[in-house]
Regions:
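Short alpha-helical segments and helix-capping/turn motifs at coil-helix boundaries
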Residues: 52-56, 144-148, 286-289
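Core alpha/beta nucleotide-donor-binding catalytic domains of modification enzymes
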Residues: 1-105, 114-127
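Conserved Class I SAM-dependent methyltransferase catalytic core
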Residues: 90-165, 169-170
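Flexible, glycine-/basic-rich loop-and-beta segments that form/coincide
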Residues: 152-225
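C-terminal target-recognition/interaction regions appended to catalytic cores
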Residues: 227-324
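Extracellular/periplasmic catalytic domains that process cell-envelope and extracellular macromolecules
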Residues: 60-61, 152-155, 294-297
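Short catalytic/ligand-binding loop motif for oxyanion handling, primarily in non-cytosolic enzymes
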Residues: 14, 74-79, 117-120, 151-155, ...
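Structured loops at beta-to-helix junctions and adjacent beta-edge loops in soluble globular domains
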Residues: 6-9, 148, 164, 304-306
Length: 324
């Protein structure tokens, strides 16, 4: 099978395609906005894969069987401040679908995106993609899943969309498999790292000393427990993960005014108004962003954005290393 990619970004999807099909991509298509993101992938291929930038006058050099894509998901992501129809990041799914289905015409074009693609926030985009597929003689299917179901100790939902060329598949689309594979525990993944390379911590702080919320949990709530003591009693929390602030509010039922009072007593003056703002936001039915220390147990949340900087070693009072 000949395959190619459009907007592969860091390249995980196209590298997986290499393994599936047993050969490198015929070419990579992209736009100038993503050149920096994709330079690592091109270097990995020793700059031997043709790279065509469509908004600089390039075009696809030929037909292939399968094309993959990892368009930016920020337009549909809950992490973004403006998810939905008015986010400019959504143009990329639309553009790539128009170009690949209209010009390249592979047997299959598929991509990965935020889980909201199949929800209310993403309905407008899904409707557009379906119409583009029909206009170009393709059927479409969407697959919602999470890493944990595929044996990866990370709770992260993702959506995958597929366009099937009707000249090959007719009016039918393949039935996609259901998976519920057992996962290796995240603490075992971390503790089984055996290397002397890149073993310096990403975050050089000491969790129990330098994160005031974690210090509050250990010293005030758990009566002087150590990091290891806490790991031993910790139970894995669904979906959001084991971030300390969620544990404080959801498990130990501490509100941010209680936490703020302790912060003031201990001299964390900058945290006091933050605690009050968080208290009021939650009281008004709004959400807050929690980016504090996370102790791994069983599995973790989405390993993106701040996560690598706040995830601890399960047993040692430190944050994970680059190799871990």
């Amino acid at each position: 099978m000949k395959h190619a990619a459009i907007i592969p970004l860091i390249g995980g999807e196209v590298l997986a395609s290499d393994q599936v099909w047993g050969n490198r991509p015929e070419y990579i298509l992209s736009y100038s906005a993503f050149k920096d993101n994709e330079s690592h992938l091109l270097n990995y291929y020793d700059n031997e894969i043709p790279y065509h930038v469509l908004d600089e006058g390039d075009s696809a050099p030929g037909r292939v069987d399968v094309v993959s894509s990892v368009c930016p998901c920020a337009g549909l992501s809950q992490y973004h401040s403006k998810p939905g129809a008015h986010n400019e990041n959504n143009q990329w799914m639309r553009k790539t679908a128009h170009y690949i289905l209209g010009e390249v015409k592979p047997l299959v074009f598929w991509g990965e995106n935020a889980p909201a693609l199949v929800g209310k926030i993403g309905k407008f985009m899904l409707d557009e993609l379906r119409q583009i597929s029909l206009d170009n003689g393709y059927g479409m299917s969407v697959y919602l899943t999470k890493n944990l179901s595929h044996g990866v100790p990370q709770f992260r939902k993702r959506s995958f969309y597929f366009f099937w060329n009707k000249k090959e598949f007719g009016e039918k689309t393949p039935i996609l498999n259901y998976y519920e594979r057992p996962h290796e525990k995240i603490e075992d993944v971390i503790t089984n790292v055996k290397s002397n390379f890149q073993m310096e911590p990403i975050n050089k702080g000491t969790p129990s000393k330098d994160d005031p919320y974690y210090r509050y949990l250990l010293e005030e709530v758990l009566d002087g427990a150590s990091h290891r003591d806490y790991y031993d009693i910790l139970e894995a929390q669904p979906t959001r993960g084991n971030d300390v602030e969620s544990i404080l509010t959801d498990v130990y039922k501490k509100d941010y005014r209680q936490i703020g009072a302790w912060m003031e007593k201990e001299g964390y003056e900058r945290e006091v108004p933050k605690c009050e703002r968080k208290y009021l936001k939650l009281a008004n039915g709004n959400n807050i962003m929690r980016r504090g220390t996370i102790v791994p147990k069983d599995y973790i949340g989405a390993f993106v954005v701040h996560y690598p900087n706040v995830l601890t070693h399960p047993h040692e009072d430190r944050y994970i290393t680059y190799r871990e």
